[in-house]
């Protein structure tokens, strides 16, 4: 029998799983700066492997989309799994295994120049089957680099 988690413990576990246990997300160097039921903030540093335009040292569009996807996924999944005061760890893992991105619509607004980037996401709506989030990516100078609307299967 698995441990029973409070909503706060479940949210913490989801954050750790998304950011620190998924190999691709670890490779991106994502850092979870803030995570609440309907808000998440991730940050990461630009690395040579993330450059899509080597002549200008611009962040690859796939890296941008990935960071936006993770940030949006955190709020969609977190809000769904913490609807009740408690959840068993087994149920959390089982439900999480059935959740995933349905659609990710990215607007690349500026070239991804910078050394450090921050993705912030907020929940727009969470239903029984589908959740939607809005995400923004800024660099260390607070330049608005990209935005996304993301839809997730959550039920």
UniProtKB/Swiss-Prot annotation:
Q: Where in the cell is it found?
A: Cytoplasm
Q: Mind listing the UniProt keywords for this protein, alphabetically?
A: Cytoplasm, Hydrolase, Lipid metabolism
Pfam families the UniProt entry points to: 4HBT (PF03061)
The protein's predominant localisation is: cytoplasm
- Gene Ontology CC, one term: cytoplasm
Give the top-level enzyme category.
hydrolase
An MF annotation (GO) of this entry: acyl-CoA hydrolase activity
Quick one: a GO biological-process term for this protein? lipid metabolic process
Task: Tell me which EC number(s) this protein carries.
Answer: 3.1.2.20
Reactions accelerated catalytically? a fatty acyl-CoA + H2O = a fatty acid + CoA + H(+); a medium-chain fatty acyl-CoA + H2O = a medium-chain fatty acid + CoA + H(+); a long-chain fatty acyl-CoA + H2O = a long-chain fatty acid + CoA + H(+)
SUPFAM superfamilies listed in its UniProt record: Thioesterase/thiol ester dehydrase-isomerase (SSF54637)
What this chain does, per the record? Displays thioesterase activity against medium- to long-chain acyl-CoA substrates. Is involved in the thioesterase-dependent beta-oxidation pathway of (9Z,11E)-octadecadienoate (conjugated linoleic acid or CLA), along with TesB and FadM.
Homology family: Belongs to the YigI thioesterase family.
What is the protein's name according to its record?
Medium/long-chain acyl-CoA thioesterase YigI
Q: Which organism is it from?
A: Salmonella typhimurium (strain LT2 / SGSC1412 / ATCC 700720)
